[in-house]
Amino acid sequence: MIAMGLEGSANKLGVGIMRDDEILANERLTYAPPPGEGFIPVKTAEHHRSRILGLVAVSLEKAGVDLDDVDIFCYTKGPGMGLPLSVVATVARTLSLYCNKPLVPVNHCIAHIEMGRFITKASNPVILYASGGNTQIIAYHNRRYKIFGETLDIAVGNCIDRFARALKLPNFPAPGLSVERYAKLGKNYIELPYVVKGMDVSFSGILSNIKRKIAEDEQVKRDLCYSLQETVFSALVEVTERAMAFSSSKEVLIVGGVGCNLRLQEMMGIMARERGGVCYATDERFCIDNGVMIAYVGMLMAKSGAAFKLGECFVTQRYRTDSVEVTWRDY
């Protein structure tokens, strides 16, 4: 089976093609506004609209297949920003109708999880899903990815990105990467609010507090980036460890764009090893939003018997991870 996946839930536009378990193409473009600016939905959607057909053509060429060779078209149903999601869904529906091939709507969060499991070969891990739009601690049970804990306000990636904008750090290739680079030069830890409530975390207060500490001195900016990472990542490690203890799992898998951060991987790895376990993570090809993860989960769904009418193939900005029945797993 050959599947094409289209992703565009935020500022990343991705087209991926897979033939069963073989990745044929994984192409991606990024909408990056000027330093200090965020991702405005209208502008993000226009970026996707003007580039998606070209990216589809590039992906087909790289994969060495024709459009007629594609057996199913898959797209991100949600969660995400409404306008960018709609652009990608419209193209996916058009391709499906034009080629008379099935269309599969995919949950963005589930796609991150299953792609992480596919790449790392993690069996049944506790999952930390950390991105610009989501922060969840997840484990599989009874054909669902259950949410053990999550952010009570803003996502960890949103917190980091907004602080990067406050510092006027570059948005390309990613504001979080700019913070990570600054953090590596930090020397002094500056105390920040640390908010963990049971299995849930909160980052809005940290963001408000750290913005008030910004100074012109470059070293202060580096120290603040370092302190922000240490604080928010410590909270994530704490709640993830609690989920591992509850589930008796020896595996933890980090997915989502923030999962690219090497310091987060290091801290989570230390915790996992102290528990006699292992931490799995992927590189930026698969941690960051991409089309191939959509193609992969679409294939899993189709092979397990999922079928959708065109009228069911819409988008939703709020599409919970635990609302999806996982029909392709038998353990």
UniProtKB/Swiss-Prot annotation:
- BP GO annotations: tRNA threonylcarbamoyladenosine modification
Which reaction does this chain catalyze? L-threonylcarbamoyladenylate + adenosine(37) in tRNA = N(6)-L-threonylcarbamoyladenosine(37) in tRNA + AMP + H(+)
Q: How is the cofactor bound?
A: Binds 1 divalent metal cation per subunit.
Q: Recite the UniProt keywords alphabetically.
A: Activator, Acyltransferase, Cytoplasm, Metal-binding, Nucleus, Transcription, Transcription regulation, Transferase, tRNA processing
Which residues are recorded as binding substrate? 129-133, 161, 176, 180, 261
The catalytic activity of this protein is classed by the Enzyme Commission as 2.3.1.234
Mind naming one GO cellular-component term on file for this protein?
nucleus
Q: HAMAP family from the entry? A: Kae1
Instruction: Provide the assembly information.
Output: Component of the EKC/KEOPS complex composed of at least BUD32, CGI121, GON7, KAE1 and PCC1; the whole complex dimerizes.
| Family stated for the protein in its record | Belongs to the KAE1 / TsaD family.
- Entry protein name: tRNA N6-adenosine threonylcarbamoyltransferase
Please give the organism.
Answer: Encephalitozoon cuniculi (strain GB-M1)
